[in-house]
Amino acid sequence: MKSSPNQLSIFSYLLGICSLDTLLSPVGRKMDAISPLVILRMDNHISSFFSEFQPNGQAPISSTDKQVTPQVSHDGQVLEFAPPRRLKTEEIPNIVDDFRIAARNAIEAGFDGVEIHGANGYLIDQFMKDSVNDRTDAYGGGIENRCRFAAEVITAVAGEIGAHRLGVRLSPFADYMDCHDSDPEVLALRVIGLMNNLGVLYCHMIEPRMCVGAGEDGSKPVIAHGRLLPFRKAFRGTFMVNGGYDRDEGDKAVADGYADLVAYGRLFLANPDLPERFRRKAGLNKYDRSTFYTSDPVVGYTDYPFLDDQNSELATR
């Protein structure tokens, strides 16, 4: 199952995924990335609340059967969500195995690592957070039970590909798709404890306050460092932060020891050579939010210019 149309899957399409890895790996090396590492983000492939994206129009699965509250998109469109189907207890091991198989396929395709997406209202988040999880079986109730699915997925993937190839993304403070928790600090520390025991390579955590990116409306993002510091101190591996950072804020986070790495999303989407632009302190392309999550293979994805292309164009004018 998919959470959006035209979403890339890695259950059987290994030849296409191999081609993607072959294409992307030299780019990482050319831009002097931290390592020639191409991370396959393991999005929750079965969390969609849009039944039209599911095989034969079947209901999307979840920890619950509660329907997501209608939401207004950035363009003013009201999104109605299909009622999900609550997973039966006996079905859950098969879902855990889906994550394991996808991770194995990623490594066989040539990727160096896998990131499990346990954030932003996807399936793992739906199990962990008490605003959604209303189960009465071994996967619901107290925090240990609510984290059981996450623990099983992380353990299975680590056992399949090695914890040294594995990262986990968490958003304890976020409220996506009605997913929020009454005690996010305790929840995140619980998962981090599991990750420490397994020796997971990195923890990728989203800031509690998603800031407006620089260049979107002329404002400069201001990030109140500190909310993620307890998790940074608790996690024994590499700690990565994300959420509205620009170059200066990212440098500060690393220099202050607040994080080991800073992840960029929207800025990277609009600037395919973002590391080089940061290195030169060059200007950035402005991203176009209206093209986010579209199915067009070019517009909004591969049509943003490289810095050298822009300089060459200016030189010929």
Curated annotation (Swiss-Prot):
Question: Which residues catalyse the reaction?
Answer: 122
Q: Which family does it belong to?
A: Belongs to the NADH:flavin oxidoreductase/NADH oxidase family.
Q: Which gene encodes it?
A: OPR10
Q: Which domain of life is it from?
A: Eukaryota
The UniProt record gives the binding positions of FMN as 26-28, 169, 244, 265-266
Q: Which cofactor does it need?
A: FMN
Q: Which UniProt keywords apply?
A: Fatty acid biosynthesis, Fatty acid metabolism, Flavoprotein, FMN, Lipid biosynthesis, Lipid metabolism, NADP, Oxidoreductase, Oxylipin biosynthesis
Recorded hits in InterPro entries, A to Z, give: Aldolase_TIM, OxRdtase_FMN_N, Oye-like
- Where, in this chain's numbering, is substrate bound? 117-120, 209
Instruction: List S-S links within the chain.
Output: none
Origin species, per record, is Oryza sativa subsp. japonica
What GO biological process terms are annotated to this protein in UniProt? fatty acid biosynthetic process; oxylipin biosynthetic process
Q: What is this protein called?
A: Putative 12-oxophytodienoate reductase 10
